[in-house]
Swiss-Prot record:
Keywords annotated in UniProt: Membrane, Transmembrane, Transmembrane helix
Superkingdom of origin organism: Eukaryota
Any matching Pfam family: ABC_trans_CmpB
TM region positions: 15-35, 41-61, 74-94, 112-132
Residue ranges annotated as Cytoplasmic topological domain: 1-14, 62-73, 133-167
Residue intervals on the Extracellular side: 36-40, 95-111
Gene this protein is translated from: TMEM229B
Principal location class: membrane
Membrane topology annotation: Multi-pass membrane protein
Assigned protein family: Belongs to the TMEM229 family.
Localisation per UniProt entry: Membrane
Biological processes, Gene Ontology terms: macrophage activation; response to bacterium
Protein name: Transmembrane protein 229B
Amino acid sequence: MASAEPLTALSRWYLYAIHGYFCEVMFTAAWEFVVNFNWKFPGVTSVWALFIYGTSILIVERMYLRLRGRCPLLLRCLIYTLWTYLWEFTTGFILRQFNACPWDYSQFDFDFMGLITLEYAVPWFCGALLVEQFVIRNTLRLRFDKDAEPGEPSGALALANGHVKTD
């Protein structure tokens, strides 16, 4: 029998970092289209986003594992949103000390120090919902089989309709 193991925290951090980076690029491209009708959809971000999103989503994963049986979904998403604001402010504040903060929300009506803005509350809430329901839950289901050979799945763990066979 194969020895499939859950992904390590570093592996999950990597997946979360890539996911956050991709979403940041897509969000900025969509924002550019909605605000400026730019059909080029130029999405931008910073390499700092890899660390910021990877770490933040890994912490949200820990929150999810502790809260999932105790808190309703919408309350968890509110908690994740508050965490996101705290994390965005903290990382932005630190990066600003080195003139390296890649965002500036000063032009928004409800910004605080240009580092966070209330206008993003709904997108952050929706993002938290999607992260919990799809990204974290599916990432926690992934397994690493250290004995598997590269290539197509075969044997007892061959895929059948997207599900792992266990018989």
